[in-house]
């Protein structure tokens, strides 16, 4: 299936399943998973089902890892780690935003071969923004190729964001204070790939949240590293991630935050 066809699948799923429920969720259509802020809706579940069915039809031998399926069956993570060919699906990234009527949500898919992300798609239905990347072929926003990022040399000029209050409230020598993310990895990574921010610090590392953005930023010169400096591995995710506009930015941030980026 060509890259445009997968993007069309995400767009159509949003039209059919996601957007009709935006700011229109009925009572009984929102559920709590692990804690009060960890939400899932009927739109998440139906969206994942539609995308999973389509990908399985196109790629019958591929392992499909959807967020909601993995939540229901944790053994799927082991199958994903062992798979030669796989896809991740985040049916609504930023569900909390979606439930609360905020436009910053996305539907995301990544394709992996032998554990390496080779294609990724991020569709933001309310913003009508598509971010697509292919390994070695660049990253694109609504069909236009994004330029290689050129972050400032001065670390105090790096624009950083984090979803974690302890990082935003922390004082790190040589770094300016970080501000809030958009609380949607698909939107966060898109802003990094577009050069709007230089670094993102995440606490959680689920593959469906980070595999799409990892390829997107790497195709414009960025990197996604674990807190210990190793390259992010979707099959064996560790807590704390630093997504940065360049290896230099990632290394600089990790060095200055070393004590904070521990599990």
Each predicted region: which residue ranges?
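N-terminal subdomain of lithium-sensitive/metallo-dependent phosphomonoesterases centered on the IMPase/IPPase/PAP
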Residues: 1-92
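Residue-level signal for inorganic ion chemistry
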Residues: 18-21, 44, 55, 95, ...
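Generic detector of well-ordered alpha-helical packing
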Residues: 45, 68, 91-94, 125, ...
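Short loop segments at secondary-structure junctions
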Residues: 58, 112-116, 126, 135-138, ...
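DPxDG-like acidic metal-binding loop motif
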Residues: 80-140
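Short, isolated positions in well-ordered beta-strands
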Residues: 118, 146-148, 232
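An extended, acidic
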Residues: 150-263
